[in-house]
Amino acid sequence: MLNRVEQELALLGITNVKEIVYNPSYEQLFEEEMKPELEGFEKGRLTTSGAVAVDTGIFTGRSPKDKFIVLDENTKDTVWWTSDEVKNDNKPMSQSTWQSIKELVTNQLSNKRLFVIDAFCGANKDSRVAVRIVTEVAWQAHFVKNMFIRPSEAELANFTPDFVVMNGSKVTNPNWKEQGLNSENFVAFNITEKIQLIGGTWYGGEMKKGLFSLMNYWLPLKGIASMHCSANVGEDGDVAVFFGLSGTGKTTLSTDPKRKLIGDDEHGWDDDGVFNYEGGCYAKTINLSEENEPDIYRAIKRDALLENVVVREDGSIDFADGSKTENTRVSYPIYHIDNIVEPVSKAGHATKVIFLTADAFGVLPPVSKLTPEQTKYYFLSGFTAKLAGTERGVTEPTPTFSACFGKAFLSLHPTQYAEVLVKRMEASGAEAYLVNTGWNGTGKRISIKDTRGIIDAILDGSIEKAEMGSLPIFNLAIPKALPGVDPAILDPRDTYADKAQWQAKAEDLAGRFVKNFEQYATNDEGKALIAAGPKL
């Protein structure tokens, strides 16, 4: 096998490899990460939890400005390219620039001792992608071993990669200015050559989200919904999917002791049902506590990999310390969560589709039931809002409209994802709900306890029996009471001492929705959806 891997690397331009560490065990990776001679960002540190912690330097998140896709015959008419009217992260790269950065990365990886991980992206055999990740850094190999689906011995014996990720995080591009790139760092994709190149950034998530962007290209073209969501399944086989941007509660709310986890971030939905793309979870750890998120807290043990957390001198972790970044993370193999779908992370068709939003404006209700038209409207809008800054007195919310709750990872036009999703929902008779995990008129965030109560009411069907009212401006159907949920919060107007305050904020937010949706009003279908949005 090693000879074959070496030959395949040589075909990519990676030559004179000193040694190939092929699909190492967790034990082996631990020893590699703990080597005393390691320096800088290669160095792992053992924590009292048993998990290894690493730092990724200035790159504590993705570098969307450094993302490029090679423009060629195959991609010119399919990719949703960035434009002056609608900006996105899919910037075109020329063939000649690609050749030049490919040489940089292959030169960097040549004459080295390399880690090669072969794994799958996609739990469904019909549509899964065989991925090979090549890196010179042990913990990066550990990260992808955690995050992708680990093949069996038999699958490895016949493994032929469909796609290769070459991680050259130690190399930067000196010619970036002449080539019209954003910086010396790059995250580039060649869909025709089936290769991803990484240079300059050490952030682990570039490998995970890179493959997600590719699944988002290939699968919808085959009629399979590709979704930035978490998913779980109840005892009766009822499947729920939770869409949402980072920090809205996807991982937290789908990790539920009463239901089995399918996955926490990326899924497909085909003729057989919903399936995970990944073999692990990548959870945020800022302010993590055993009390609020017991399953995630307990998943942080040997074989988990922490990124950018603050480790105290005694090796314990200070989860509340966001001094390196608010985006502290842990990756772990999915089986670190007790309650998962086994042996394959897939289940039947979804009957509940939940859109999570964290509305910092304090306008949206904690839960509303959507009509089919509203489902399309709120899916394409992909709204959430953050509270800016941690300085005292600065509480100005910043709205984010991210198409399909994952604009950064969409390789095709957003309407293609909406179309496939709605088709799948219609076929399974799925209902959609908008759940606000953010703030209300009290100035406080809606409690996890109330949000869990809302999710329970959606999943056990009690929301269907609730008497409904309507929220003006947004025309959303809201329940008047739900078991286990504080009734005072269900209508957001009731959380304000003065309802006129809600009205003013609601008009402001509605205006932002209307403005954002103008980009979809370029055809008849888009124009027809405007009626499902807020009315001023």
Swiss-Prot record:
Q: Which reaction does it catalyse?
A: oxaloacetate + ATP = phosphoenolpyruvate + ADP + CO2
What's in the GO CC field? cytosol
Q: Which UniProt keywords apply?
A: ATP-binding, Cytoplasm, Decarboxylase, Gluconeogenesis, Lyase, Manganese, Metal-binding, Nucleotide-binding
Q: Which cofactor does it need?
A: Mn(2+)
One matching Pfam family is PEPCK_ATP
Listed GO molecular functions? ATP binding; metal ion binding; phosphoenolpyruvate carboxykinase (ATP) activity
The record, for SUPFAM superfamilies, names: PEP carboxykinase N-terminal domain, PEP carboxykinase-like
Q: What is its main location?
A: cytoplasm
Supply the name of the protein.
Phosphoenolpyruvate carboxykinase (ATP)
User: Which organism encodes this protein?
Assistant: Glaesserella parasuis serovar 5 (strain SH0165)
Q: Which gene encodes it?
A: pckA
